[in-house]
Amino acid sequence: MTDVYRVGYLERVPLGTPYPSIVAHLGSLLGRLPDAELVIDYTGVGRPVFDMFRISGISPIGVLITGGATETHEGFVHGVPKLTLISRLQVLLHEGRLKIHKDLSEAETLVRELQDFRCAFTAAGALTFNARSGRHDDLLLALAIAVWRAADGGMSNPGLFRYYEQQYLKLVGGSSKPRDVVGVDLGQSRDPTAICIVRRISDPVDHIPLREPRPPPQPGNLEWSLIEREKL
């Protein structure tokens, strides 16, 4: 069974929008996607903003982006290495399984963020991933955490669950239900809040015009090109 990840919604909330307004806006979006999960970047804003969602009746999953190599889990918050998040996007790009709806207003912005993202080694020899100096990566991070969760990130024994699901679907002749995840990189003083909605589809039928990311020109190079300026 092949999974494809479709980016169907991208938004950058105006800079300076108060967090209560962002919470209300996301509540409205989730109201239109009743089965969707909300995943937010817990790294910069921490517990106070996370609790705003819970008080409003929304139960998000927090992702604390780390520089390590191992995922951790405490309550509703998962510590996820940035290497894990970015390498997963790389794999999907190479395999042609990350697709973007062609008419999204922020699609070009996301492309630029992907192109501006760089890998580098610290003095201690650790591999790091960061946006080029002076550039934003909010849409990229919203996409990365949404894809992480849509790919069963943070779940216990996801492979076993998918196996039994597939066996059941074979018996009844059905197909896997699409999985929607809303990823949010909460902005701070100089960065806007970014929202990305990803849908995971198994054995999809390509009937919607999409932009398909292209793999990087050289293996392992993060400087890939998702789309070219051409008519689809």
Predicted regions and their residues:
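Catalytic cores of nucleic-acid endonucleases
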Residues: G79
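Active-site proximal helix-loop segment of RNase H-like, two-metal nucleases, encompassing DDE(D)
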Residues: S87-R97
